[in-house]
Design a protein with these regions (language model features):
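Long, contiguous domain-sized segments
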Residues: 1-231
C-alpha cells in the first residue's frame, strides 16, 4: 500500500489529507481529511488520516496491508526523530490495536521539495539533468537519503526532491525503492509524462487543498472517498 500525506489551508481552515492505494496495481484509491494543527495535534492528525485510509484498504481487501510505503511532504527543518517516535512507531502500535496484533512492514519517506541544490550536465554548455537522474552519494548524508529529479524543464533550473527514508522495514532494496518513486511520478492521471513528486503525494496535496479551499473543511460523502474527486 502506498500512502501520501500533505496539508492544505485557506484562512482559518487548516487540513491534513491522506491518500492511499487499495489495490495491487496502485490504480484505485481512498482518501481522508482531518483538521491539522501544530505539535502533538499535527502528529495526531497524521495518525488519524493514515488509519482512515488503512481502514479503506481493509474494507476492500478484507484485511489490512502487510506493507506500507508512506510519503510525507516535509520541510528542511523537520526533525526526523520526532516523526520516528510520534508518527512511525505510534502508527504501528495503533494498527496492532485496531487489527488484532497485525504487524505491518513500514517504510516512511520524508519528501523535501524546497532545496538549494541544483544539478547540471558536465559539459561546456551546462543544462538541467535529464528526468530520472539519481544522486545518492558525495553530497548526501550517511543516513538513507537521496535526490531524484523526475520532471522535465526547459526553462530555469530544476529543483530536485530530497528523499529521506526515516523508517525502512520493506524488503525493497534501495535501488528498487528509488525506481518505485520515479515510476510513481508517471502515475498522475491529469498529466501526460512525469510530475515532480510521486502521484500518491500529489493526490494527497490536491485533496487537502480542495477540501480547504472549496469544501471549507466539510466532509464528503463516503461514496466519494474512493474517487479522485479533488483532481
Amino acid at each position: 500500500m502506498l500512502v501520501g500525506i500533505d496539508v492544505g489551508s485557506k484562512g482559518s481552515c487548516n487540513l491534513m489529507a491522506a491518500c492511499g492505494t487499495i489495490n495491487s496495481t496502485f490504480s484505485l484509491y481512498t482518501s481522508a481529511t482531518t483538521k491539522n494543527g501544530d505539535g502533538d495535534r499535527k502528529f495526531n492528525a497524521m495518525q488519524e488520516v493514515t488509519l482512515k485510509v488503512v481502514e479503506g484498504y481493509a474494507t476492500r481487501n478484507k484485511a489490512p496491508p502487510k506493507e506500507m510505503i508512506i510519503f510525507l511532504n516535509a520541510s528542511p527543518g523537520d526533525q526526523i526523530n520526532l516523526y520516528q517516535e510520534n508518527y512511525c512507531r505510534k502508527l504501528q502500535e495503533n494498527i496492532k490495536k485496531a487489527y488484532n496484533n497485525h504487524e505491518v512492514q513500514l517504510t516512511v519517506v520524508m519528501v523535501n521539495l524546497r532545496n538549494s541544490e541544483r544539478f547540471f550536465t558536465a559539459e561546456n554548455n551546462p543544462r538541467n539533468v535529464a528526468p530520472g537522474t539519481l544522486v545518492s552519494s558525495t553530497i548526501v548524508s550517511k543516513n538513507y537519503d537521496f535526490f531524484i529529479i523526475s520532471q522535465q524543464s526547459n526553462k530555469g533550473s530544476i529543483v530536485p526532491n530530497h528523499y529521506k527514508v526515516i523508517m525502512s522495514e520493506s524488503k525493497l532494496e534501495e535501488g528498487h525503492l528509488q525506481e518505485l518513486i520515479f515510476s510513481q511520478c508517471f502515475n498522475y492521471v491529469n498529466w501526460l509524462g512525469s510530475i515532480k513528486i510521486p502521484a500518491i503525494l500529489m493526490y494527497a496535496r490536491k485533496c487537502a487543498r480542495f477540501s480547504a479551499e472549496v469544501m471549507n473543511g466539510m466532509d464528503v460523502s463516503s461514496g466519494l472517498q474512493s474517487r479522485l474527486y479533488y483532481v
